[in-house]
Amino acid sequence: MKNRTINERLHDRCWEWFRGMRMDSPEDLLRGTGTDGSSISSSLPWPVAAEALASGARTSAGFRRLKAVCDVVETVGPVDGRFYAGRIRSWDEAVLDDPKIAAIDSWGTPIRWPGPLLGLPRAFSPTTLRYLATALWLKREGYVKPGGTVIEVGVGFGGLAAMNAVVSGASTRMVDLPQVEAAARRMMEECGLGRFCLADDAGIDSGDCCLVSNYAFTELTREIQDGYLEKHLKGAGRGVIVSNAGVFAATIGGRSDQELLSMLRDAGLPAGIDKTADLLGPADHFCKVAILHWKA
């Protein structure tokens, strides 16, 4: 990866200042731990904020501005946002005009960056752009089929599930902490996409579905990874795991990229690893993110 330019550094620095001025952190929503210690995000106040949304203790307005959400889920900066905007324009520019995309971007009142700085006609949340680019890439590469099924490990606020619904008409079985799953389902319902949420594994043809995990699987302990391997990964005919194991493996006691690759192959999955995929943005390359993938 080329060195970051002064322009890019200033861009991200301005974003951090701008974002910090607009983040909200109401103490009454962030008390408690909400954690079982099994993952990086479960040790942060994010699950508490998700539970508040899922239970109806708060509305969705401003949800994506909560510090707890910004620290874990709403994390993409403007330099990466501009990168993803470029990918979207290259792959399917017309989708940017879809009102359903606008509804997803508006949900939770995220902090947006001006359109001209992203190379777009209007402001967007950079995180929204990453989810949209990911959904387009998954469809483009044949991992998520039109009208297909996705098992998503680590669902955030539901952004990728929503984008897969709009881009591919795909339904998603969410796998996360119960309160996070419930919060993401609420988001899907409020965006008119509730019918694309699968409540359980009933009726899922595992051989014809795609297992997707945007970082989350590599932020789990080995024990949890083993359980998910048996329950969700082994039978999935296709899979994409965006891995930041290089950052978190030692911290959480998870596996390195090579250990993950061996785990998948030992389970009979024809897995490969790609560190140059055109989905990976500047921050991914800086953090040595890789994509583990397979197609049976």
What residues fall within each predicted segment?
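Conserved Class I S-adenosyl-L-methionine-dependent methyltransferase catalytic core
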Residues: 32-145
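Conserved class I S-adenosyl-L-methionine
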Residues: 146-156
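Conserved SAM-binding loop of SAM-dependent methyltransferases across substrates and taxa
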Residues: 157-169
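A short SAM/SAH-binding and catalytic strip from SAM-dependent methyltransferases
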Residues: 209-223
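A short, conserved alpha-helix within the catalytic core of class I
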Residues: 220-232
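S-adenosyl-L-methionine
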Residues: 186-206
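Class I SAM-dependent methyltransferase SAM/SAH-binding core
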Residues: 170-193
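Conserved beta-strand signature within the Rossmann-like core of class I S-adenosyl-L-methionine
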Residues: 236-248
